[in-house]
Amino acid sequence: ITAHPSKPLLYITATGGDPGKVPGAVVFLKKDGSYQKHQNINFNDGACYLSLDKENRHILGVSYGNGRLNVYRLDEQGIPGKAVTTIDEGKREAHCVLLPPDGKNVYVPYVKGNLALLQYAYDGKTGKVTPLEPKDAKPPLGSGPRHMAYHPTLPMVYFSNEQGIGLSSYRREANGQLKVEQDI
């Protein structure tokens, strides 16, 4: 689930279903925050995590089951259309997708046996996602980066770790690459 930051909308999706027909909904809220109505929509894949880009032009989702990243363009009312980008790296257990404050990159952490932290350039106008080189930021062995948060003023990204039950901090370089600073 995620909320639109400037419209009274919530986005929800199931975690499973037939490809391209995964049930989801846009929930319209009343002024007091209560449910007004909803509109059923279909997503390519079930998403364990949804987030919007900086300009609120696209909603991004990652699937824990098949590991795919999907980017959907939003119309003027905030309703997702068909995916404009789908990335399938052949990994499972993606856990989160959350763009940095400048909106220029996408980072997708994978846990368990698929240990990876994939990094991409992001074009907020088109929703296009392009791998950085190297694509994998190589999280510390046994860490399992799960969810992330950005420092409000510094180029730092923090990940909670599922396997290591800890915290890893990364410095975000000017080119978008993540470099491990601490693993505690």
List each model region and its residues:
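Short glycine/acidic-enriched loop and turn motifs that connect beta-strands
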Residues: 16-20, 65-68, 112-115, 164-166
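Residue position within the beta-strands of beta-propeller blades
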Residues: 12-13, 61, 108, 159
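Beta-propeller domains
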Residues: 13-34
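Loop-centered beta-sheet repeat module
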Residues: 107-165
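A generic, well-ordered mixed alpha/beta core segment in the N-terminal half of proteins
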Residues: 39-76, 83-86
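A short beta-strand motif characteristic of beta-propeller blades
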Residues: 36-41, 82-88, 132-139, 182-184
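Beta-rich, blade/repeat-based domains predominating
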Residues: 1-5, 19, 43-58, 88-105, ...
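Short loop/turn segments immediately following beta-strands, especially the blade-tip
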Residues: 28-33, 72-79, 120-129, 170-178
